[in-house]
């Protein structure tokens, strides 16, 4: 019986986290109370306090348990691209955007991060969350270095600048799309968006190759 009770408690805890994600994304973190979350989850205020001391603890737990976007898209990537760092990078960027476009929970989390939260010192640091939902700087640098070695990224480019541009371009694409999701089909446009960003860093002779790459990547 105790085992079942523990399982039920864990199930309730996760339901509260999922409800909090929906409430935070809709109303904003500062405007959402634990009582709002309890009501939406159809539990008592006492029940939510049994699991979380306060809203900040719930907020932090929500992000701490969240896998990175890099982990979430891994199963949707093509095997065998390890020796082609440029195509590997291209695919990850496309599939990442398409995953966001298809998965409402991911959209809700990103809305919270970009549009619905004012961070304070007690919250998990914004930079930690942004890295979880975006690029790992060291990994991105290593991939870009490999691309330069293979001639896919121009050798005269400063990779620090390239990384800033890539991070700004894709976080900007996602932020703007989340404000007007009906404005365009992010899933369909993902290959073109990625190719136009990457084209800025390619030697001229490689651009023609990119134009002929298939745009038929899909996460589903």
Swiss-Prot record:
Cross-referenced InterPro entries: DNA-bd_HTH_TetR-type_CS (IPR023772), Homeodomain-like_sf (IPR009057), HTH-type_Tx_Regulator (IPR050624), HTH_TetR (IPR001647), Tet_transcr_reg_TetR-rel_C_sf (IPR036271), Tscrpt_reg_MAATS_C (IPR013572)
Pfam families hit by this protein: TetR_C_2, TetR_N
Keywords carried by this UniProt record: DNA-binding, Repressor, Transcription, Transcription regulation
Source domain of life: Bacteria
Record-annotated HTH tetR-type domain positions: 10-70
GO molecular function (one): DNA binding
Gene3D superfamilies, A to Z: Tetracycline Repressor, domain 2
GO terms for biological process, alphabetical: negative regulation of DNA-templated transcription; response to xenobiotic stimulus
A Gene Ontology cellular-component term: protein-DNA complex
DNA-binding region: 33-52
Signal peptide: none
PANTHER family in the record: ACREF/ENVCD OPERON REPRESSOR-RELATED (PTHR43479), ACREF_ENVCD OPERON REPRESSOR-RELATED (PTHR43479:SF11)
Function: Potential regulator protein for the acrEF/envCD genes.
Name of the protein in question: Probable acrEF/envCD operon repressor
């Amino acid at each position: 019986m105790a085992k079942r009770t523990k399982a039920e408690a864990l199930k309730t805890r996760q339901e509260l986290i999922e409800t909090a994600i929906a409430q935070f994304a809709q109303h904003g973190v500062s405007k959402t109370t634990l009582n709002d979350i309890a009501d939406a989850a159809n539990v008592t205020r006492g029940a939510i306090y049994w699991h979380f001391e306060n809203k900040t603890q719930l907020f932090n737990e929500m992000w701490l348990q969240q896998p990175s976007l890099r982990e979430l898209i891994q199963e949707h990537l093509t095997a065998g691209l390890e020796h082609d760092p440029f195509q590997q990078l291209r695919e990850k960027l496309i599939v990442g955007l398409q995953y966001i476009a298809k998965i409402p929970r991911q959209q809700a989390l990103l809305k919270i991060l970009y549009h619905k939260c004012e961070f304070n010192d007690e919250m998990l640091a914004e930079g930690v969350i942004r890295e979880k939902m975006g690029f790992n700087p060291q990994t991105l640098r290593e991939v870009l270095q490999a691309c330069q070695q293979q001639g896919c990224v121009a050798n005269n480019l400063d990779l620090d600048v390239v990384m800033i541009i890539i991070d700004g371009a894709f976080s900007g694409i996602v932020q703007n799309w989340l404000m007007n999701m009906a404005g365009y089909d992010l899933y369909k446009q993902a290959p073109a968006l990625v190719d136009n960003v990457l084209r800025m860093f390619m030697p001229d002779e490689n651009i023609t190759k990119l134009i002929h790459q298939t745009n038929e990547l899909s996460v589903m």
